């Protein structure tokens, strides 16, 4: 494994242990490319998690976009000089960013479409702003772009061209993964004033945006504040129940489709094996997920992923 790929693997180990552990079940020759893919996704998602000013976030996203395009262009020029290095050497921009370097190698080695990586950058722009997610369809499109795309790319690394069934599996799995991430990150997005629960779902259930965006505060009598607090709690329960129902719908469809795929694709989906454990916590906590992080130990993640890897039980 090249130095840049090793860097990506260690990045996964520190930020997203389930991704790191899942990569270890892939064939050794494919691990570096998978680590690079996941590391790129993490870096893109990390921008919305850390940046408070949208303009700064836009600049960082544009940097990743431009750096990847420049690396691919320079690598093609380099390949014209030394054709035999097209899949085995690191690109010229390796010294600038190891994630860009490793992703460039993966794109060239496995003929991955660069547009898919740019799709990640474009979809992540929503994370920079405080606009409410407009509809369930928009949320599913967002999740497919940020998570389903990565699953599709992982499948291409593992097995070459993907079938319609594999694409369907990736779509449902990506939406389920995105919805679980939505719930897991609620304490942070709540602090940032961001709302990912779709406006049309909220409206259909009589939940107003302010019930999700604000906590109870003010100079009202204690009795009135308590009443408002109880109303907000009930509305948040309704909102979370809607997202949980949507998750179960997509995760069930994912499992049904995944069982029909060749075993060689399985490592791509192993990170999803930990999702039910997070969702069970969310179902117990209900509205508390807005303020309390959902945490699963690395050992439990290992157990869930290992069971899926050996027995195909998600």
Per-region residue spans from a language model:
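Acidic/His metal-coordination segments adjacent to aromatic residues that form catalytic metal sites
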Residues: 125-138
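A generic structural motif
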Residues: 159-161
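Catalytic cores of transferase enzymes with a strong primary signal for eukaryotic protein kinases
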Residues: 82
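Catalytic cores of Mg2+-dependent Asp-rich isoprenoid enzymes
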Residues: 1-75, 85-106, 110-124, 141-152, ...
């Amino acid at each position: 494994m090249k130095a840049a790929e090793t860097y990506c693997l260690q990045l996964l180990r520190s930020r997203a242990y389930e991704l790191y552990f899942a990569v270890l079940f892939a064939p050794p020759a494919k691990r570096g490319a998978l680590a690079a893919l996941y590391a790129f996704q993490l870096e893109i998602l990390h921008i919305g998690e850390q940046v408070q000013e949208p303009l700064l976030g836009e600049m960082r996203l544009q940097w990743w976009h431009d750096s990847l395009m420049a690396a691919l262009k320079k690598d093609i020029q380099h390949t014209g000089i030394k054709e035999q290095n097209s899949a085995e050497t690191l690109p010229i921009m390796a010294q600038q960013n190891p994630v860009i370097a490793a992703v460039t190698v993966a794109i060239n080695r496995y003929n991955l479409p660069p547009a898919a990586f740019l799709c990640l950058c474009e979809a992540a722009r929503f994370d920079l702003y405080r606009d409410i997610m407009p509809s369930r369809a928009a949320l599913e499109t967002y999740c497919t772009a940020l998570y389903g795309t990565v699953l599709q790319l992982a499948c291409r690394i593992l097995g070459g061209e993907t079938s319609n069934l594999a694409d369907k599996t990736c779509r449902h799995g990506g939406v389920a993964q995105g919805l679980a991430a939505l719930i897991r990150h609620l304490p942070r997005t709540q602090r940032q004033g961001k709302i990912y629960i779709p406006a049309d779902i909220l409206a259909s259930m009589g939940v107003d945006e302010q019930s999700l965006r604000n906590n109870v505060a003010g100079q009202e009598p204690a009795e009135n504040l308590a009443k408002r607090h109880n109303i907000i709690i009930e509305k948040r329960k309704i909102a979370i129940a809607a997202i949980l129902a949507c998750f179960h719908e997509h995760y069930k469809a994912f499992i049904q489709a995944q069982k029909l795929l060749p075993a060689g694709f399985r490592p791509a989906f192993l990170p999803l094996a930990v999702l039910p454990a997070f969702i069970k916590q969310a179902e117990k906590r209900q509205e508390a997920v807005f303020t309390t992080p959902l945490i699963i130990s690395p050992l439990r993640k290992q157990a869930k992923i290992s069971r899926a890897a050996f027995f195909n039980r998600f």
